[in-house]
Amino acid sequence: MNIDILSQLIAIAVTLFLGPVVVILIASRNGNL
């Protein structure tokens, strides 16, 4: 398996997972949740 493709997929997965989490954390901190 190509390491470059694997690392790119992992980076995309991490971004897609952390994106909503950060938004939820910011919203809950601001009391908008």
UniProtKB/Swiss-Prot annotation:
Assembly and binders: PSII is composed of 1 copy each of membrane proteins PsbA, PsbB, PsbC, PsbD, PsbE, PsbF, PsbH, PsbI, PsbJ, PsbK, PsbL, PsbM, PsbT, PsbX, PsbY, PsbZ, Psb30/Ycf12, peripheral proteins of the oxygen-evolving complex and a large number of cofactors. It forms dimeric complexes.
Source species of the chain: Oedogonium cardiacum (Filamentous green alga)
Gene Ontology BP terms: photosynthesis
A GO cellular component annotation in the UniProt record: photosystem II
Listed name of the protein: Photosystem II reaction center protein Psb30
InterPro entries (UniProt xref): PSII_Ycf12_core-subunit
Transmembrane segments: 5-25
Keyword Cell membrane: no
Function: A core subunit of photosystem II (PSII), probably helps stabilize the reaction center.
Key words of the record: Chloroplast, Membrane, Photosynthesis, Photosystem II, Plastid, Thylakoid, Transmembrane, Transmembrane helix
Pfam family, one: PSII_Ycf12
Coiled coil: none
Localization of this protein: Plastid, Chloroplast thylakoid membrane
